[in-house]
C-alpha cells in the first residue's frame, strides 16, 4: 500500500555539503537539473526539496540475527520502493531493533538512491509516441537474478512479477513485459535486478540523444 513520504521542515535544514547549499539557496531548482549537471545526491533533504510528494511502499520485512558477546540480537531488515509515479524511482533498505525505525532508515536510504528513468514507446506494435513504456529492452542483474524488461504496446499493462510491478508503477511505467532468470523468490535481489535494469535506460545513447547533442 502506497504511503506518502513524511515531509521535513526545510527552514530548519542546515546543509552539510556544497550541493546541499546550492539546493537550499535556489541555485539548483529541480531534480532534473541536478542529474543534468551530473551531481550526486549528497543529503536526503535534497530530494525533499527538489522532488516533494514522493510515495513509498514496504515490499519486504525480514528478521535478521546478529551475534554479539551478549548473545544473538534480532533486528528488522526492511526493503522499500519509492517514487513519484512519473519518471523517478528508488529502493532503500534499513535495519533496526524497532520496525518503525527500520522503515525510517530505509526511506532515508531510498532518497539517496533516487534514479531518473527514461520512458518511451519502444514497441514495434505501438506508434503512439507517448512515454507509457520503455524505449528499448534493458537488462539488470543482482546476485543470481537477471531481469529483462521489454517495451509493450499501450494498453498491455505490466505483465511482470508482483514486486517488479510495484517498482515499475512507482517509476511511472504503465506497459511492459519481462523475462527473468535465477532465484526470483529472493525479493531483495529481484527488486535490485529490476532497479538495475531501470538504471540502464540511461546507459544507452539513442538517435534522439545524438541529435540533441549536435
Curated annotation (Swiss-Prot):
A biological-process GO annotation: translation
Subunit and partners: Part of the 30S ribosomal subunit. Contacts protein S4.
SUPFAM superfamilies the record matches: dsRNA-binding domain-like, Ribosomal protein S5 domain 2-like
Entry keywords, A to Z: Ribonucleoprotein, Ribosomal protein, RNA-binding, rRNA-binding
GO CC field: cytosolic small ribosomal subunit
Role, per record: With S4 and S12 plays an important role in translational accuracy.
GO molecular function terms noted in the UniProt entry: rRNA binding; structural constituent of ribosome
Family note: Belongs to the universal ribosomal protein uS5 family.
Name under which the protein is recorded: Small ribosomal subunit protein uS5
Record gene name: rps5
Note on domains (UniProt): The N-terminal domain interacts with the head of the 30S subunit; the C-terminal domain interacts with the body and contacts protein S4. The interaction surface between S4 and S5 is involved in control of translational fidelity.
Domain S5 DRBM intervals: 54-117
Amino acid at each position: 500500500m502506497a504511503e506518502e513520504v513524511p515531509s521535513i521542515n526545510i527552514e530548519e535544514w542546515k546543509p552539510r555539503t556544497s550541493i546541499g547549499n546550492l539546493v537550499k539557496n535556489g541555485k539548483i531548482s529541480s531534480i532534473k537539473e541536478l542529474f543534468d549537471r551530473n551531481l550526486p545526491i549528497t543529503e536526503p533533504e535534497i530530494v525533499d526539496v527538489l522532488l516533494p510528494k514522493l510515495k513509498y511502499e514496504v515490499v519486504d520485512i525480514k528478521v535478521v540475527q546478529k551475534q554479539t558477546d551478549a548473545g544473538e540480537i534480532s533486528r528488522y531488515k526492511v526493503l522499500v520502493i519509492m517514487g513519484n509515479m512519473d519518471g523517478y524511482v528508488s529502493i532503500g533498505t534499513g535495519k533496526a531493533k524497532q520496525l518503525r525505525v527500520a522503515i525510517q532508515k530505509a526511506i532515508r536510504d531510498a532518497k539517496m538512491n533516487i534514479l531518473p528513468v527514461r520512458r518511451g514507446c519502444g514497441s514495434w506494435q505501438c506508434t503512439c509516441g507517448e512515454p507509457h513504456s520503455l524505449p528499448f529492452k534493458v537488462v539488470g542483474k543482482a546476485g543470481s537474478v537477471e531481469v529483462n524488461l521489454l517495451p509493450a504496446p499501450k494498453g498491455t499493462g505490466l505483465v511482470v512479477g508482483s514486486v517488479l510491478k510495484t517498482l515499475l508503477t512507482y517509476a511511472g511505467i504503465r506497459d511492459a513485459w519481462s523475462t527473468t532468470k535465477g532465484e526470483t523468490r529472493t525479493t531483495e535481489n529481484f527488486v535490485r535486478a529490476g532497479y538495475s535494469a531501470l538504471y540502464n535506460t540511461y546507459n544507452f545513447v539513442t538517435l534522439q540523444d545524438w541529435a540533441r547533442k549536435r
